[in-house]
Amino acid sequence: MNEADMLFSVTVPGSTANLGPGFDSVGMALSRYLKLTVFESDKWSFEAETETVAGIPAGTDNLIYQVAKRTADLYGKEMPPVHVKVWSDIPLARGLGSSAAAIVAAIELADELCGLKLSEADKLHLASLEEGHPDNAGASLVGGLVIGLHEDDETQMIRVPNADIDVVVVIPFYEVLTRDARDVLPKEFPYADAVKASAVSNILIAAIMSKDWPLVGKIMKKDMFHQPYRAMLVPELSKVEHVAEMKGAYGTALSGAGPTILVMTEKGKGEELKEQLALHFPHCEVDALTVPKEGSIIERNPLYQVKSV
């Protein structure tokens, strides 16, 4: 594959979801990325460029192809075959939005190959239909911090563009599949608990919109929707929470379904907190991340544009 054959690239950030009580609604982009580099070809194929995605299906059984094809089919279009190089540092099944990033990238892929000219709202709704909720997908699509509601016929989203914080993630070296994490959740919620849980979630949203990050951190651990049930799957959660609190962090939450644990701290203090947490959790990967203001980015090859005129 040479430069002249490259059509375009798609770069999509990973994400965290929930921030505690913002269950299936609140998402935040993180500075881990998935990148697709797309080349002209006579057949569909996928090539892994990083260890993170080693072993992904190389043909049309790849998730990215399947989502892209469903998107094209919805608009009555047929995609031309391409070769796709896949680069990613978003670990799979760790609660950092790897599947949502792949879905957003796939929709962007179909949009570019078929000239669909999808709006941001179109892309959000299509991605949310695939995911079942808009938190991770919305954050990967537009960047920043998002609050969303997905219904079959419509997806609503509010974007908070400047999350002026640092984030440290503690990533255990085991997977928690989303379906397993959902299996531990209760099938029903007592009315009184639902009322209290809703109030907690309301305060989280108000604190986010006010950019009162210390309050956001305090409220994250008051979640009643999922963390009390999923904590058994991630034994590091309470320990990270304790150490982070001792080091002055704003707060701690499961990232999505876990097992990654997200710690929110003051802007400029992420690297220092990363070093401190790494000392306490040597059996985990610990990384300092930022909240990118941009979501998915398309970069087109000018050589291809000239050739296509």
UniProtKB/Swiss-Prot annotation:
Binding site for ATP: 91-101
RNA-binding as UniProt keyword: no
GO biological process: threonine biosynthetic process
Major site of localization recorded for this protein: cytoplasm
Keywords: Amino-acid biosynthesis, ATP-binding, Cytoplasm, Kinase, Nucleotide-binding, Threonine biosynthesis, Transferase
Record Gene3D superfamilies: 3.30.230.10, GHMP kinase, C-terminal domain (3.30.70.890)
Function of the protein: Catalyzes the ATP-dependent phosphorylation of L-homoserine to L-homoserine phosphate.
Name of protein: Homoserine kinase
Source organism (scientific name): Bacillus subtilis (strain 168)
